[in-house]
Amino acid sequence: MKQLTILGSTGSIGCSTLDVVRHNPEHFRVVALVAGKNVTRMVEQCLEFSPRYAVMDDEASAKLLKTMLQQQGSRTEVLSGQQAACDMAALEDVDQVMAAIVGAAGLLPTLAAIRAGKTILLANKESLVTCGRLFMDAVKQSKAQLLPVDSEHNAIFQSLPQPIQHNLGYADLEQNGVVSILLTGSGGPFRETPLRDLATMTPDQACRHPNWSMGRKISVDSATMMNKGLEYIEARWLFNASASQMEVLIHPQSVIHSMVRYQDGSVLAQLGEPDMRTPIAHTMAWPNRVNSGVKPLDFCKLSALTFAAPDYDRYPCLKLAMEAFEQGQAATTALNAANEITVAAFLAQQIRFTDIAALNLSVLEKMDMREPQCVDDVLSVDANAREVARKEVMRLAS
């Protein structure tokens, strides 16, 4: 029986994780749930899964949760704040920590889990985008095991040989017969939109993803392919891959989730329905397998699988991310922070779709790119980039 802390339990990854627990009550027990401000959903989760602890981001939400749980006779202990979240990630009897808090808020709790030597089911993109070197160093020191949840990285992980799986971030790809990693992406809803029309695309149009169901911010990142750019950065860290060992491919059907090319000419791929419960269940049960609740892939119903190289004129954010990796962690952190601000501005209809990439570049050009030495340095770069991005948005929107 694996004991689990879920960081970000009320978000889409958190809910999918709990669904895997629901399908496998004999394999997993929820010890702690950590969330932001969604009290209603947290109440439902606490009543169904009876965790020992529930943590809300702020005191007001925690107070409300406590009252509501007491009314229902729940014995779950309610806490609040970042330190409590970090404590839950490092609890002695917890085996696995699902790191699914979105954004910079997820950094310290994820790092706490790494330092405690846990098995970390990594769904928080920002961890490696902003703290790749710091986190991978901590993984090595504490002998923690990282298991990637993101569907693409999970597909790559499943397609890699065991020596690499057990030494993630440090194993030599070439020594293990790997030539390159093929990262696939759907290309988003504007894959075939004429370039001249991109400026007029609306938030609602950007959020209509053809294959995956996901939140609005990530949907926009899919439309700009910034999500693939961030995944590229993550993959470089996770799999110890050089630029020449990475290939990015557009694959509109999202059936092949990513591939690994080997020296002998073999290419191994992981296929499946586009449902996050598959990679989540894989990481939770690794090295075994459990029922994820996902319906089997029906090959007879598949249309043709197609592939194309990404067009950087259509997806300038992808190119920005690839270039930022070469500049270092200050650049990747600044890009990620700027992108959160610009995407929020686009969703609020303050700027146009094409302004997202232009403003992200503008922020990078204005930042001091000294390499961060600790999480506080990273958070400082993050805060500065957000400030610069806000000013850029205001300049453009006024």
Swiss-Prot record:
It catalyses: 2-C-methyl-D-erythritol 4-phosphate + NADP(+) = 1-deoxy-D-xylulose 5-phosphate + NADPH + H(+). NADPH binds at T10, G11, S12, I13, G36, K37, N38, N124, E126, G215. The keyword Acetylation does not apply. InterPro entries: DXP_reductoisomerase, DXP_reductoisomerase_C, DXP_reductoisomerase_N, DXPR_C, DXPR_C_sf, NAD(P)-bd_dom_sf. GO terms for biological process: isopentenyl diphosphate biosynthetic process, methylerythritol 4-phosphate pathway; isopentenyl diphosphate biosynthetic process, methylerythritol 4-phosphate pathway involved in terpenoid biosynthetic process. Mn(2+) binds at D150, E152, E231. Divalent cation. Prefers Mg(2+), Mn(2+) or Co(2+). It comes from the Bacteria. Its cofactor is Mg(2+); Mn(2+); Co(2+). Inhibited by fosmidomycin. Optimum pH is 7.0-8.5. Optimum temperature is 40-60 degrees Celsius. Keywords: Cobalt, Isoprene biosynthesis, Magnesium, Manganese, Metal-binding, NADP, Oxidoreductase. Pathway: Isoprenoid biosynthesis; isopentenyl diphosphate biosynthesis via DXP pathway; isopentenyl diphosphate from 1-deoxy-D-xylulose 5-phosphate: step 1/6. GO terms for cellular component: Dxr protein complex. It is an enzyme of class 1 (oxidoreductase). Belongs to the DXR family. PANTHER family: 1-DEOXY-D-XYLULOSE 5-PHOSPHATE REDUCTOISOMERASE, 1-DEOXY-D-XYLULOSE 5-PHOSPHATE REDUCTOISOMERASE, CHLOROPLASTIC. This is 1-deoxy-D-xylulose 5-phosphate reductoisomerase.
